[in-house]
Amino acid sequence: MSHRHTAYVGRFAPSPTGPLHFGSLITAIASYCDAKVHQGKWLVRIEDTDIPRIYPGSEAHILACIDAFGFQPDGEILFQRDRLDLYENVLEQLKAQNLVYACQCTRKMLGSNAIYSGTCRNLNLPFQNQAIRVKVKDQLICFDDRLQGIQCSNLAHDLGDFVLKRRDGIINYQLAVVVDDYMQGMTHVVRGADLLDNTQRQIWLGDLLGYPRLHYLHLPLAMNAQGQKLSKQNMAAALDLSKASQYIQQSLAALHQPAVDLDTPDRMLKQAVAQWQLNHIPHQTRLAGTYL
């Protein structure tokens, strides 16, 4: 499958499962600078399909951060909760092509097995009130990450058929992100290395749907003092909007970018774009040092 031969379109796509933290800001700044240095568009998408995990107030904090840190999205902010019918339509398309099947396996039944064995693949179960899995093949899927280099995975060996819709009716992240990246005309994805192993799944699904492949860049992760990646699950501190300029300086330093003058956030971002050096970012999955 070929790549899109169009102007750069990138995005920042946080989930409102908690407030934005320093690790989130690193991703936002890197994706913004990379888009702007290529004279591209930078879009914001709120990935809020997993309703039970949404944390009260986090969406408002995300939107406040976008404004306070001087980001200027090139279009309206998209909310996945408004697009559930679209995802269902794509699922129907996959059903019609016999590329997915219903699965009745529970977490208890699967136990600790990381690789799904295909228990339900040939049972022809009704789709109602069941999870929906997409079929994978025994083949190698590779992509050339712009920072991490060549990445390969055989989904049949490493993962097995994976879920696109949960039995509780929640659309899985993998389906929603692939559909939205295509519908929004995305060409480039800049995100954290914690999502590196999601990429082959998304490439596989995009190939099944006939979507052009994207260009990927997976950033090294900021870590806390315990050696854990900064995340909502690890209780990373929420960004303090009153310290936006200082956070921008710290984020650029973490990415090994040239220093920018302490100024208003929007002016600092403009200077960061003008000085952006992708080859300065460490070619690893973790950043040295600790970040609170």
UniProtKB/Swiss-Prot annotation:
Pfam families named in the record: tRNA-synt_1c
Role noted for this protein: Catalyzes the tRNA-independent activation of glutamate in presence of ATP and the subsequent transfer of glutamate onto a tRNA(Asp). Glutamate is transferred on the 2-amino-5-(4,5-dihydroxy-2-cyclopenten-1-yl) moiety of the queuosine in the wobble position of the QUC anticodon.
Name of the encoding gene: gluQ
Record-stated family: Belongs to the class-I aminoacyl-tRNA synthetase family. GluQ subfamily.
Disulfide bonds: none
Species name: Acinetobacter baylyi (strain ATCC 33305 / BD413 / ADP1)
Motif extent ('KMSKS' region): 229-233
GO cellular component: cytosol
UniProt-recorded name of the protein: Glutamyl-Q tRNA(Asp) synthetase
Protein's UniProt keywords contain Lipid biosynthesis: no
Keywords linked to the UniProt accession: Aminoacyl-tRNA synthetase, ATP-binding, Ligase, Metal-binding, Nucleotide-binding, Zinc
Binding-site list for Zn(2+): C103, C105, Y116, C120
GO molecular function: ATP binding; glutamate-tRNA ligase activity; zinc ion binding
